[in-house]
Amino acid sequence: MPAPAPTLPLPPGTVGPAYIEPTHLALPLLSVRAACGFPSPAEDFFGVEDLLDLNQRCIDNPVATFFMEADTGESMVGFGIYPGDTLVVDRSRNAQPGDIVIAIWEGGFVCKQLRKRAGRFELHSGHPDHAPIQVPPDVELEVWGVVTWTFRKQLRR
């Protein structure tokens, strides 16, 4: 069953729904973890433990999940989000303080960390040069979705 059309316009850079038809591409998930320090010589043998389907791993609610590209700028690098990263955004989640969200602010879409201080919401970047956006008490903050995963191509050629 195809995903219903979203009720709000998609922001520029949105690739579109993450779910159109149920597709499965299960790839081998190795039973060994990749060491990011010195490798263990005891792990000379490894096998396939399971199959990994990125749809199942990354998408909790297919009809409410969208892919979006992080725009230029480095305001979110402190949270591990770099320009050009692919963001997986779930519109069905209720945003909680600490979540990375896509919010509608001053007529545009922004990717920020949602925080609450003294009963008021703030949108924080992950860069010290960018001051938090303090949401005035008379303004309703519209959260378009919650960023649940990010992807970045490591090979630069």
Would you name each region that the model predicts?
Residues 88-89, 102:
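Hydrophobic beta-strand signal
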Residues 128-134:
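Flexible, small-/acidic-enriched active-site or ligand-binding loops
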Residues 97-121:
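Short, compositionally biased
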Residues 84-85, 99:
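Structural motif
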Residues 41, 120-126:
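Short, solvent-exposed secondary-structure boundary/capping segments
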Residues 1-77, 108-109, 116, 142-144, ...:
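Short, positionally conserved secondary-structure boundary motifs
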